[in-house]
Regions:
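C-terminal structural segments of small proteins and small subunits
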Residues: 65-92
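Short S/T/G/P-rich N-terminal loop/turn motif that feeds into the first structured element of a domain
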Residues: 1-53, 59-70, 94-100
């Protein structure tokens, strides 16, 4: 069953994010078979005061998300992402299947 990784964050260094993080993370997204459904620096808030950066990724499973996040080769990119963002919140959720 598919699983979704949902991240909200404020990107504090858009140039570094675009030029270093995004190209660096793409091979990991391919390796773990992630589909990028949403990637936006300026999402429109509808309620509350959320961070404007939103990323939604679909993975084949929750384990694939954990495997990417735990991949030793990903750790330098994670450190980079955390250094150029603020207010980051991430959740993982399984795909919803309508009962019946």
């Amino acid at each position: 069953m598919s699983a979704y990784f949902i991240l909200t964050q404020t990107v504090t260094d858009p140039q570094k994010y675009s030029e270093e993080y995004i190209p660096g993370v793409m091979p990991f997204l391919q390796k773990y078979k992630a589909d990028v459904l949403v990637a936006d620096f300026e999402a429109s808030p509808l309620q509350g005061d959320p961070a404007k950066g939103v990323v939604v990724l679909r993975f084949p499973s929750e384990q694939a998300i954990r495997d990417l996040l735990d991949d030793p080769a990903y750790q330098p990119l994670k450190k980079l992402r955390l250094s150029i963002t603020a207010n980051a919140n991430a959740v993982m959720a399984p795909e919803f299947k309508m009962p019946g």
